[in-house]
């Protein structure tokens, strides 16, 4: 299992499926759901033809890393400045917010 968040464009094989999934987004909450997923992806090589094609999953669902997406300066900066500083997350009123000491953070600041 990959410990850090994979870059967009990475291709993985999920547990209990023979299909590959390409990562197209990270740290996502599907509309109408109070669950945060590490990733949203699409079936490879077909891609996205409608919103029904989106696959939401977490790191622990990854069986095998097939391809690592682009890791340039922008990706590394994004990961270090944004993703690494997020810590634990929660969904509050439909928005992703950081959790400090198991309490939701006030996002009105």
Question: Can you say where each PLM-predicted feature lies in the sequence?
Answer:
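Intrinsically disordered, low-complexity, charged/polar segments
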Residues: 42-109
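Canonical SH2 domain fold
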Residues: 25, 39-44
